Design a protein with these regions (language model features):
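Outer-membrane beta-barrel "beta-signal"
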Residues: 165-178
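Short loop/turn motifs that connect adjacent beta-strands in outer-membrane beta-barrel proteins
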Residues: 93-96, 135-141
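Detector for outer-membrane/organellar transmembrane beta-barrel domains
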Residues: 1-128
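Extracytoplasmic/periplasmic mature domains of Sec-exported, cell-envelope-associated bacterial proteins
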Residues: 24-26, 125, 137, 149, ...
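A glycine-biased, small/acidic residue-tolerant capping/turn segment at secondary-structure junctions
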Residues: 112-114, 142-144, 151-162
């Protein structure tokens, strides 16, 4: 079992005079796992408030990504957002390797209510399956396939319409540890 509480001091990044004046951000994350013997289950959840996308200082760049699939923070046009996410997963030994499965859900909305850019609400669903196989004590191969579906809702005052982008990703590789 793990619990983490983080606070982000936005006043150290934004001075509130020439740029933004935001309340400090907060995340609370809980997670744990349990080994049932035949399979290991994982569960985690996170609450977040007053968070910003990685590139929140460049709202114009974010606006250009609205018609493509992006990190969900970019849907908020540089505004702070709040919400929660949950993730459940499982791994089990299969054919000498390990099969992996996970599902997740995120729900987020504007932290400050609506403004001139319009109110935004987002839901994201995701699922992934994978497999890893040890070739030796220090080397393994892996493959993962994932699918994510977003539902972005904008109010009438927004310059962007509602849209539901999705993405599918497949990757594979070999890992060697030293």
């Amino acid at each position: 079992m793990t619990a983490v509480v983080d606070s982000y001091n936005w006043s150290s990044k934004f001075d509130g005079v020439t740029s933004r004046n935001l309340d400090d951000a907060l995340t609370v994350t809980l997670g744990g796992s349990y080994d049932f013997g035949v399979a290991k289950a994982y569960l985690s959840g996170q609450y977040f408030d007053n968070m910003l996308a990685n590139d929140a200082t460049n709202a114009a760049a974010q606006k250009d990504t609205m018609d493509t699939y992006a990190s969900f923070g970019s849907y908020f046009n540089g505004k702070a957002f709040k919400g929660y996410s949950i993730l459940a997963g499982m791994d089990a030994p299969v054919l000498g390797g390990k099969a992996l499965f996970a599902v997740g859900y995120t729900d987020a909305k504007d932290a400050d209510g609506s403004d001139a850019l319009g109110k935004t609400e987002l839901s994201r669903y995701g699922a992934s399956v994978g497999y890893t196989y040890d070739l030796s004590r220090r080397t393994n191969v892996y493959a993962v396939a994932a699918y994510y579906k977003d539902s972005v809702d904008k109010d009438a005052s927004s310059s962007h319409q509602d849209h539901d982008p999705s993405t599918a990703t497949i990757y594979a590789g070999i890992r060697h540890t030293f």
